[in-house]
Amino acid sequence: MTGFVCRVWSSTHQERDPVRRRLFAAAMLAVVAATGLSACGDSDPNVLKVGTEGTYAPFSFQGSDGKLTGYDVEVIQAVGDKLGKRVEFVQTPWDAIFAGLESKRFDLVANQVTVNDERTAKYALSAPYTTSAGVIVTRADNNAVTGLADLNGKTCAQSATSNWSKVATDAGAKVEAVEGFVQAIQLLKNGRVDATVNDNLAVAEYTKKTGDTGVKIAARTGSVSKQAFAARKGDALITDVDNALNQLRADGTLAKISEKYFGTDVSQ
């Protein structure tokens, strides 16, 4: 387009006729306006863009058919249905997921965002749709960890920006940063770390699917956490999401999705 404008101007800028100059200027303004409208037309009000990992079973992962599935995925799809919006997922590593939200790559995060004071101050969080407990996972032959206090001086594999990373560091552990739970388990089994702290639901899903007897739940952290969807602070979208969640809770949809993945209702 730039080359076109330059060529047209070079052949016409010597024209003395004011009518032609006005016509040329009007034409160029029309081109610029059309280009601007085209650039701004990428946002579809009927689409809800959602950031999620896609590697965190059973919440957000690739199914056997290669398609994204999981508890969080199905819940936010049900929310989208209530809002009359098509959900479009943007797979993003956990440690980059809030940066993606802030830069408007997507509208919402659906990835077991644990509610805490820091996140409540920085983001608009929905009503919780999951309740879970923290657990400490060690190698099966490790009997040195029987409680949270035993993590003091130990090394834990954690996603650096996760709530579980904070739990570990608050207990005095050194954190080895990983991209997700699967990598944390690999480091644990390889003897590179002493433990990892995570959600009891994620750990139960891992042991159920893999039958891995090389690791165990050594202790509970003693805390119960709630998870929510996250939007940018001040975004009215979160009110619509809350209304949809209330409807899904009332009509039994949340409980049904929960039973499918966990065999019990974890949405309360």
Regions found by a protein language model. Give the residues of each.
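C-terminal motif of bacterial Sec signal peptides marking the signal peptidase cleavage site
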Residues: 35-39
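Extended ligand-binding regions for polar small-molecule ligands
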Residues: 41, 73-82, 142, 162-163, ...
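Extracytoplasmic small-molecule ligand-binding "clamshell" domains
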Residues: 44-112
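Short loop->beta-strand "edge-of-pocket" segments that line small-molecule binding or catalytic clefts
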Residues: 49-52, 148-161
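Short helix-initiation/N-cap motifs at beta->coil->alpha
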Residues: 73, 89-101, 143, 161-162, ...
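Acidic, polar ligand-binding/catalytic clefts
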Residues: 77, 86-150
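Alpha-to-beta junction loops
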Residues: 84-86, 103-111, 154-155, 190-202, ...
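Periplasmic-binding protein-like
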Residues: 131-138, 204-246, 264-268
